[in-house]
Amino acid sequence: VLSQTDSHQHAEGKWAQASARIYIEPQMDETFQGAYAEAIKNWNQTGAFTFEVVADPSQADIVASEMNDGSTAVAGQAESQTNLLTKQFISVTVRLNHYYLSNPNYGYSYERIVHTAEHELGHAIGLDHTNETSVMQPAGSYCGIQPRDVKAVQELYTSSD
């Protein structure tokens, strides 16, 4: 069992508004494409943040991708470029890791893959890890998006800084 879902380094960041354009790589594994689509739908249903799926990567703020890396002990990854002056994201790439998520020995159900996608998209929104019951727990991917996660996004995007 992985000790944590990802190795997110906390870089303060958020978008100028509570929405971003996301490109889902079409050559990606269908299971991962489906998991991202479901995670996007679930975040959009909260009303706190809107992901707009775009067909052209050059139009995207966020790229949803995949990796297959056993040298890292993470099921997913979010890499962000942030403008250090404005503290706003320039771009974010999220990745789901086949090495763990697609390996039956690690026992990831489809639901947990969706939760991992929700977690990485949470980082792409600007959320950090929390030890509360939350989709942003560092480990496990047993939780989907919780009311506290919606509240955290609302607070992030209503704060003036």
Where are these regions (language model features)?
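Zinc-dependent metalloendopeptidases
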Residues: 1-161
